[in-house]
UniProtKB/Swiss-Prot annotation:
Belongs to the NAD kinase family. The keyword Transport does not apply. It is an enzyme of class 2 (transferase). Keywords: ATP-binding, Cytoplasm, Kinase, NAD, NADP, Nucleotide-binding, Transferase. The lineage of its organism: Bacteria, Pseudomonadati, Campylobacterota, Epsilonproteobacteria, Campylobacterales. Pfam families: NAD_kinase, NAD_kinase_C. It comes from Wolinella succinogenes (strain ATCC 29543 / DSM 1740 / CCUG 13145 / JCM 31913 / LMG 7466 / NCTC 11488 / FDC 602W). It is found in: Cytoplasm. This is NAD kinase. Its EC number is 2.7.1.23.
Amino acid sequence: MILMQPLSSLSKVGVILRPSSPSLKEFFLQVRSLFEREGIEVMLDSISGGMIGIYGCDFQRLCSESDMLVSIGGDGTLISVVRRSYPYGKPILGINMGRLGFLTDVRQDEVEAFVQKLKAGEYRIDSRLMLEGELSSPKGTQRFFAFNEAIVTRRPISGMIHVKASIGEEPFNTYFGDGLIVATPTGSTAYNISAGGPVVYPYSKNMILTPICAHSLTQRPLVLPSEFEVELEMLEGEFANIVVDGQEIMDFGYGDRLRLKVAERPALLVHKKEHNYFQVLREKFSWGDA
């Protein structure tokens, strides 16, 4: 789903910088000046502020008071901001300072012109499906949200793992191998594609299940509609890990259960009006090159 309507007003933005990058101070000052020139107030989160020696506010206040969040870094920074700010439902603009820039499509040299377009309402807001996870174990229940994927994976020096998968209350498969990826359409071009999973249009409402190095030639990726809930259970073998968007890790042991479903609300990403997903695929993956 694509939301073509911009915000009714844009008076304040909250900025989050890529961690461990104090060299971003000069660029942040430039970005702040560009927004302020358009009459838009700029807030900075406290962790970013401490990194570059400028006052910042706590993340909760930043999200609550801002009309839009601005992530300055790479795709990893944007994903972190999406996950942390998800309860607040704010649209997020990604300025690309990284290598890939699959999600952060505004380059450094485009910022000045794009800030003017933001003020004029000449942009679009895309909605991206999120996953909601619930891990039940003897330690209790942990809930989380995933933007790209949740992965059940063996530990670095352990053997293969055995995972039972059910759709709703119906068991449908067991996976024996290095792990299993449950990805969103947005995450289909991340770890999922490296493991042989399909590319799924990011505005589709699906979940993708892709085995990692399965010990069977018949184990293949599966695309499910969004109304299904997937339950994963460890059957035997050593402890495994659950890795969420490459940024959060949890233990997953014998008898533990992981439930995954499509979250009630999507994440909101700010893009140029002319943003074209298939053009991004061609450029980032070098598709069509002779």
